[in-house]
């Protein structure tokens, strides 16, 4: 099953997440199909906190991809801000 989920990066105590489309059988930080955005929870100043390609997310959801709970909340926040 294909899912849209977060992939953790960054350093210890400074997380940075890529929003990716991946096969659910792959590891959290493993192989993915497409990168559709990022989420930086520790962004400060004028640094960008959230960037999502809503058109590509819409495409993947239309083809049957499941969305993780956290990514669903991020999509809702991004749509509200746009």
Swiss-Prot record:
Some GO term, biological process aspect, for this entry: which one? translation
Give a yes or no for keyword Transport in this entry. Answer: no
Q: What InterPro entries has UniProt attached to this entry?
A: Ribosomal_bS16, Ribosomal_bS16_dom_sf
Keywords per UniProt: Ribonucleoprotein, Ribosomal protein
Domain of life of the source:
Bacteria
Q: Does the keyword Nucleus apply?
A: no
Gene Ontology molecular function, alphabetical: structural constituent of ribosome
A single Pfam family, by name? Ribosomal_S16
Q: Which Gene3D superfamilies match?
A: 3.30.1320.10
One cellular-component annotation, GO = cytoplasm
- Record's family? Belongs to the bacterial ribosomal protein bS16 family.
Output the NCBIfam families linked to this UniProt entry.
Answer: S16
What name does the UniProt record give this protein?
Small ribosomal subunit protein bS16
User: What species is this protein from?
Assistant: Aeromonas hydrophila subsp. hydrophila (strain ATCC 7966 / DSM 30187 / BCRC 13018 / CCUG 14551 / JCM 1027 / KCTC 2358 / NCIMB 9240 / NCTC 8049)
Q: Which gene encodes it?
A: rpsP
């Amino acid at each position: 099953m294909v899912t849209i989920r977060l992939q953790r990066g960054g350093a210890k105590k400074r997380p940075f997440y890529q929003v990716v489309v991946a096969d659910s059988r792959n590891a959290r930080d493993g192989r993915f199909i497409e990168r559709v955005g990022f989420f930086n929870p520790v962004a400060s100043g004028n640094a960008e906190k959230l960037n999502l390609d809503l058109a590509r997310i819409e495409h993947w959801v239309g083809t049957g991809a499941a969305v993780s709970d956290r990514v669903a909340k991020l999509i809702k926040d991004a749509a509200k801000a746009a």
